[in-house]
Regions:
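Duplex nucleic acid-engaging cores and interfaces of nucleic-acid transaction enzymes
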Residues: 1-186, 190-192, 199-200
Length: 200
């Protein structure tokens, strides 16, 4: 993995032969194993994850689709059938409603980002040339993003969005309750009261 990652020279298959043993049967297995290790390295890079997170925060869209065959059952969620909007602009009450729809098995939510922009950023971070070893690194980066980084960042972004939506909902409820508790019981009508404890 270090040999490929260094991206010096293209005699990778020749150099991979010394890693063939009882556990690693072929040169191809050795190269695949090395690419898996590189994918892990990319995934564990805090800098790489921060770049991906930044792109998602700016451009990720929340895609909401109705589960096939659930159109009638989930009619109350019909406003959200087959919609797409930027996650950062999604109102808290809409997000919470969509999440309820997903929990009830009516809606399916996904985050969609510009994968080509993400991969371009990652390539710039790790790929140093255009030879065979660099192409292998590019392949490992793509695998790392699709298999490891993307699912993790999507879960993180959705959890953060839900947490913020919950906070907004609680604040709104508290504000409405406060107004209700402090409102006069009979509105603007005048009330005459007698205090039985008052002595003359």
């Amino acid at each position: 993995a270090k040999i490929i990652m260094s991206q010096h020279g293209d005699d990778i298959e020749y150099r991979a032969r010394k890693f063939v043993n009882d556990n690693v049967k072929t040169v191809d297995d050795a190269i695949l194993g090395a690419k898996d290790i590189i994918a892990e390295w990319v995934s564990e890079s805090a800098n790489a994850r921060n770049r991906v997170r930044s792109i998602y925060a700016r451009t990720a869209s929340l895609v909401c689709k109705v589960v096939k065959g659930k159109e009638l059952e989930g009619e109350k969620f019909s406003n959200y059938f087959n919609t797409e909007e930027l996650l950062k602009r999604c109102a808290s009450h809409r997000l919470l409603a969509m999440l309820r729809g997903e929990a009830e098995g009516v809606l399916k939510l996904n985050l969609k980002a510009d994968d080509s922009e993400v991969l371009e950023k990652l390539y710039k971070m790790f790929v140093k040339g255009s030879g065979m070893s660099s192409r292998m690194v590019s392949s490992a980066i793509e695998d790392s993003y699709k298999r490891l980084i993307k699912p993790s960042i999507e879960t993180e972004m959705m959890n953060a969005a839900k947490q913020e939506a919950d906070r907004v909902a609680i604040d709104t409820f508290a504000q409405n309750l406060r107004q209700l508790l402090f409102a006069p019981p009979l509105g603007k009508r005048r009330v005459l009261a007698i205090d039985p404890g008052y002595r003359t």
